[in-house]
């Protein structure tokens, strides 16, 4: 416990919260260009080929973003919108691509949770 005199001299240091998505710079989304589209494997108990892309953002950051949903149309030089949100079993992936905006197409034949995958309402 510090004495009153020590607190007068120094004061308490406030704990500063560290951002989980620093590349967004306090914005809800950011635009970027795909520099590489590839698949990667998840951590230990899981097994799959997860679709990810390396994105160069408009602010100069280079980040890895997860492409959710079944199938995608992204390739190098595609313009994508990035939102925050990590993928627990992919180390280093802290962003998601927004489906159905800019060059990213929505998921085909999606019936449920359509708004999350940029799918229109089926007729």
Curated annotation (Swiss-Prot):
The name on file for this protein is: Small ribosomal subunit protein uS12
Organism in which the protein naturally occurs: Chromobacterium violaceum (strain ATCC 12472 / DSM 30191 / JCM 1249 / CCUG 213 / NBRC 12614 / NCIMB 9131 / NCTC 9757 / MK)
Q: How does it assemble?
A: Part of the 30S ribosomal subunit. Contacts proteins S8 and S17. May interact with IF1 in the 30S initiation complex.
Q: Which Gene Ontology terms describe the biological processes this protein takes part in? A: translation
HAMAP family recorded: Ribosomal_uS12_B
Q: Name one GO molecular function term.
A: rRNA binding
Residues forming coiled coils: none
Q: Which InterPro entries match?
A: NA-bd_OB-fold, Ribosomal_uS12, Ribosomal_uS12_bac
User: What's the family?
Assistant: Belongs to the universal ribosomal protein uS12 family.
3-methylthioaspartic acid modification sites are 89
Q: What are the record keywords, sorted?
A: Methylation, Ribonucleoprotein, Ribosomal protein, RNA-binding, rRNA-binding, tRNA-binding
